[in-house]
Amino acid sequence: MEESWSAPGDIEDAVRVVDRWAPIVHAIIRATPQDKLVDWKLVYRDPLPTWISPKARIALLGDAAHPFLPTSIQGASQAMEDGVTLAVCLELAGKVNVPKAVRAYEKIRYNRVMAAQKTGETTRDKWHKTDFDQVKANPASIKLPREKWLLDHDAEAHAYAVYADTAASLRSDVEARPSL
């Protein structure tokens, strides 16, 4: 599959995708000038093995570290959690321990972010493989769960609570981590 931000779209391909949708949707697509139609694919990315440089002086945050599908409804939230966690780690480590802060940031965030990414896959599958006749019979079947672990998390408080133990654990496993 070709990836591009600006690959030209095809009106007939778009109409096929919405085959069973309301006629007004078909009319809107057919009224779109061909040269204005973009085939913008949503592409999944497996989690990176690490978000930090080998010397832990550079850290990726947000979509640069862990791109989310739009169905995750978590991209911006997770980027903010990254930012506040890194800020807490830098504050607590101090200027002389930036590499320790960066490593702690990754360790604190990594597993939570991977789990959050998986929610996007689940939602994507639920929405893209929907039996709309079943939804019509039971509208609640399409409702997404409100996952407290994801939506009610206080990343700043969490970072303050776990930083000391996380930083202490880094001494033994720094050499074992993959490098970027």
Positions of PLM-derived features:
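FAD-dependent flavoprotein oxygenase/oxidase catalytic domain
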Residues: 1-180
